[in-house]
Amino acid sequence: MSNPFRTVFPVVLLAFAMTHATSAVADDASAGFTRCMDAAEGVTVDMLNCIDAETSLQDARLNSEYRRTLAAITTRQQARLRTAQRLWVQYRDANCAFLTDPAGGTLATVMSVDCRRQMTTERASELARLRDQTRVS
């Protein structure tokens, strides 16, 4: 007899992941990402293309925010930020790789790549806030 949990759980998980992705869109993701995901209408390959394009955009934003933040802080803080950023990249990659479950099918792939997009977006915003706070202090 088939385990209904194996069928229902991935569907619920995907719905949750896409709801979370949509809420993240309202914060710092590009308007193009919102439009792309709406147009994807739940088609996995289209969603993956949207996520990939947004991840590239957010990765460029992250690199820019990182450079700008480094330029705005003291030499001592720069060394600490470099260490923190290296460790953060390792954490992001390990965390998102954890979501890639070969038994999870396309759902696991969507979750893994969207994890990278979300974490990259959040880190870019965090670095911008840190830089702004440093200017005020």
What are these regions (language model features)?
Residues 8-20:
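Bacterial N-terminal signal peptides
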Residues 2, 22-137:
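N-terminal alpha-helical modules
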